[in-house]
């Protein structure tokens, strides 16, 4: 866990493998769930997505055989959301992030905020910026609406609804520190920026029936 927090991902993997071998003889499903979840996060961090998915499946298998506390369930749902978003299945990812937000909120865990942020990100990636505002009027989400991490998503949704590359760039600049520290948001917004850029180019050339390239 400490190596993951310190971003020493490759050093963490052999230790996780060794720990899993020892835990399987003890048959402690709760700890197995935690370690497989950590394995999934570490593999995701080094972009080994097949192993990340396999580890998450193992974590869920272990969790399904015991009573899984809300906090652990929320962490599993968060990782599921992240992996579905990577696969561009933003609709399923948004559902997982909603479950995550509810789970963390039920135990007053601050990780409800990034869960909400990722759910809003999914709506933006689905080209549904208007849903960002309706979600933020909900009972749980409204508690976090003024948080700076959520303000980022509102600014991006606003830019997207206007198909404004200028507003999008302004939002990226205004919330630079929040965005640079979150690799998940940064990667998806980079793809969105490319899409907006393409839309803006198309909007410029739409009035012309014939274009001559120099």
Name what the model sees in each region.
Residues 33-37, 44, 53, 57, ...:
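Alpha-helical scaffold segments of alpha-solenoid architecture
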Residues 5-7, 24-28, 45, 64-69, ...:
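Short coil/turn linkers that connect adjacent helices within long alpha-helical scaffolds
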Residues 6-18, 48-58, 92-98:
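Helix-turn-helix repeat elements of alpha-solenoid scaffolds
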Residues 1-10, 14-24, 34, 38-41:
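Active-site lining segments of carbohydrate-active enzymes
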Residues 2, 15, 21-25, 58-65, ...:
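Residue position in alpha-helical solenoids
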């Amino acid at each position: 866990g400490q190596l993951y927090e310190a971003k020493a991902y490759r050093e963490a993997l052999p230790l996780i493998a060794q720990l899993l071998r020892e835990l399987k003889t003890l048959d402690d499903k709760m700890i197995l769930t935690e370690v497989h979840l950590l394995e999934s996060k570490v593999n995701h961090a080094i972009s080994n997505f097949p192993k990340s998915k396999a580890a998450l499946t193992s974590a869920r298998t272990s969790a399904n055989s015991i009573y899984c506390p809300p906090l652990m369930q929320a962490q599993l749902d968060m990782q599921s959301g992240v992996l579905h978003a990577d696969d561009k299945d933003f609709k399923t990812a948004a559902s997982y992030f909603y479950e995550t937000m509810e789970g963390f909120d039920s135990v007053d865990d601050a990780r409800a905020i990034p869960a909400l942020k990722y759910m809003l990100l999914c709506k933006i990636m689905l080209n549904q910026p208007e849903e960002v505002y309706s979600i933020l009027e909900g009972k749980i989400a409204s508690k976090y609406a003024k948080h700076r991490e959520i303000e980022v998503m509102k600014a991006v949704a606003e830019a997207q609804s206007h198909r404004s590359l200028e507003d999008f760039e302004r939002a990226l600049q205004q919330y630079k520190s929040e965005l640079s520290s979150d690799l998940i948001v940064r990667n998806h917004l980079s793809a969105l920026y490319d899409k907006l850029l393409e839309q803006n180019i198309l909007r410029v050339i739409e009035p012309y029936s014939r274009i001559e390239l120099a």
